[in-house]
Amino acid sequence: MTISSPEREAKKVKIAVDRNPVETSFEKWAKPGHFSRTLSKGPNTTTWIWNLHADAHDFDSHTSDLEEISRKVFSAHFGQLGVIFIWLSGMYFHGARFSNYEAWLSDPVHIKPSAQVVWPVVGQEILNGDVGGGFQGIQITSGFFQLWRASGITSELQLYTTAIGGLVMAAAMFFAGWFHYHKAAPKLEWFQNVESMLNHHLAGLLGLGSLSWAGHQIHVSLPVNKLLDAGVDPKEIPLPHEFLLNRQIMQDLYPSFAKGLAPFFTLQWGEYSDFLTFNGGLNPVTGGLWLSDTAHHHLAIAVLFLVAGHMYRTNWGIGHSMREILDAHKGPFTGEGHVGLYEILTTSWHAQLAINLALFGSLSIIVAHHMYSMPPYPYLATDYGTQLSLFTHHNWIGGFCIVGAGAHAAIFMVRDYDPTNNYNNLLDRVIRHRDAIISHLNWVCIFLGFHSFGLYIHNDTMSALGRPQDMFSDTAIQLQPVFAQWIQKTHFLAPQLTAPTALSATSATWGGDVVAVGGKVAMMPISLGTSDFLVHHIHAFTIHVTVLILLKGVLFARSSRLIPDKANLGFRFPCDGPGRGGTCQVSAWDHVFLGLFWMYNSLSIAIFHFSWKMQSDVWGTVTANGVSHITGGNFAQSANTINGWLRDFLWAQSSQVIQSYGSALSAYGLMFLGAHFVWAFSLMFLFSGRGYWQELIESIIWAHSKLKVAPSIQPRALSITQGRAVGVAHYLLGGIATTWSFFLARIIAVG
């Protein structure tokens, strides 16, 4: 950190806007394709509607003015937030109007959450299953009930008011989106002022956001949950404002409240340990993290981010400059290092987006793994359907974000990369030795693929030949994951040294006792064996292939030996023109297309592994005789052969969805069928030739002309790229909905 000389702080930061830059015109807005000179003329062929969808949000294609593009993106973000608030409001409204939330609060172990009641049209009311507490409805697995309880919501009226608040926020967001594009649009310099942005996002969004959540947890969530855990009727619990206004209620629950802020200012922070704890592990009553631990966590996080939000230099000549940090970042082997990256990150929003999507996607997958191993909300861990849904959801969201990172990194390379500004810096050096990177990564993929798959093929062969003693398994030739087991043991023992006052380790998965709530396993030590070792190497293989495809797309987006002038052809193109055979499907867009399939492969195996492992080794009932798991520990015996995965996971566990007709789960049976159809429909687009369809269309047009009913807009076959886009969309939609119905019918029936 440096104190700057006067000339270094000459450029004062100020809020700079243009007044009324774009008039509000519903006439223009209502005209399809108003953003493009070509499209606004209207359709000649059916390709027009496809181009309309492809380019509506591609602001780069509307204008080359970076300021105008930035304003459109900024305004669109407010629109996105508005839609999110409407969605959130809808969730809370359903909780208020159509749910058994108050009944669930009184007995969260035996009553299942439901917030959707189907109207009795054509017999659909069969879907309203008995979820307990005298309520008929669809069992939900979103985790909202557990989140609401953790927030201290005790009545449906509170959900109503929050839902209304969500709509008010949505209106504010839509207004802001309009205002900051049409009335007071920020200048480019405002968008490029990274130090102010960092300070505001770190201190404001993350710092004050965490602090206000910690305050809510301490003053509302903790007392409400303490009373709920003690068995107090939700209707008897004081309203949230009473905890704030009447200190006596708080003193009865947390004696240190009587001391006020004196311990804080005299640094006697230990006095507050009755509501800011460091217990570790799970609350044995609810099976969730101790809410006093999470309040402590958010308070600590808030302090860190509030400090971080004062680190960057703006008008006061103190703090870091982002450009100086990047320009100074040179290592012995990295040439010019990060020189030139500041320009990239302030002039290419695609580059920014690529980095943020990669980080955010990875974070989502990390969240998926923490939601089950350290379940943050009360009674979340014993709601197996919700646990499975949250793991699956956060994995898929993360996968899409990471593929999106590859897409926008490639768009940056094609549209925004300037070779003259990037000489011998890290980016240039990576691009110059891309052949070494990609060929090594390819070798890794081949190695992982053959070896991991080879272990399974060996096991299937030995099993087929009746030679179990020659298989890789926990009972024959063991391949124990010794490093993973060492990590588990270390994390289990570590708190004895690092946090001697903690009650237990961070997660019950490391070791120790079973945490049971209401006779169900919330969490317990997860033992790893040969079957886990095998499938983990399949995970490594599929993830590396996904990375190979995406990284090759980025590094070869501008040029390759096959097509040296690829940058001139753009982000997506079908082939390098006529007369150049073998150059189809090489665009950066096509790499994203292929990457999506491998992302789907990777995550399918990850969520299948999770689903089976948890049913086999964790989830189940607890009696005096011990733990009885849902599938009785069959993962270790069966998951070491491909046949075992097909027979004992896919086939055995799909019986619930296949046999769901005539029951409350029958919608999942219909969805399972329909999603298979959507998936199969995708193959028609993926295995098609464009010329075949054009020929067919022309003979159909001939027939229409004969009957004098030919359309004025000429039908055309989908382009190669459009066909692949439609194909991958239906492939993923069909695959995801198939998995969704398979998982939920199974876990709701047995969990």
Swiss-Prot record:
GO molecular function, one term: chlorophyll binding
Topology in membrane: Multi-pass membrane protein
Family classification: Belongs to the PsaA/PsaB family.
Record: residues binding chlorophyll a: M684, Y692
Record organism: Tetradesmus obliquus
Record protein name field: Photosystem I P700 chlorophyll a apoprotein A1
Chain sites annotated for binding phylloquinone: W693
Catalytic activity reported: reduced [plastocyanin] + hnu + oxidized [2Fe-2S]-[ferredoxin] = oxidized [plastocyanin] + reduced [2Fe-2S]-[ferredoxin]
Segments passing through the bilayer: 73-96, 159-182, 198-222, 294-312, 349-372, 388-414, 436-458, 533-551, 591-612, 665-687, 725-745
Keywords: 4Fe-4S, Chlorophyll, Chloroplast, Chromophore, Electron transport, Iron, Iron-sulfur, Magnesium, Membrane, Metal-binding, Oxidoreductase, Photosynthesis, Photosystem I, Plastid, Thylakoid, Transmembrane, Transmembrane helix, Transport
Function: PsaA and PsaB bind P700, the primary electron donor of photosystem I (PSI), as well as the electron acceptors A0, A1 and FX. PSI is a plastocyanin/cytochrome c6-ferredoxin oxidoreductase, converting photonic excitation into a charge separation, which transfers an electron from the donor P700 chlorophyll pair to the spectroscopically characterized acceptors A0, A1, FX, FA and FB in turn. Oxidized P700 is reduced on the lumenal side of the thylakoid membrane by plastocyanin or cytochrome c6.
Self-association and partners: The PsaA/B heterodimer binds the P700 chlorophyll special pair and subsequent electron acceptors. PSI consists of a core antenna complex that captures photons, and an electron transfer chain that converts photonic excitation into a charge separation. The eukaryotic PSI reaction center is composed of at least 11 subunits.
Ligand binding (chlorophyll a'): H676
Keyword Transit peptide: no
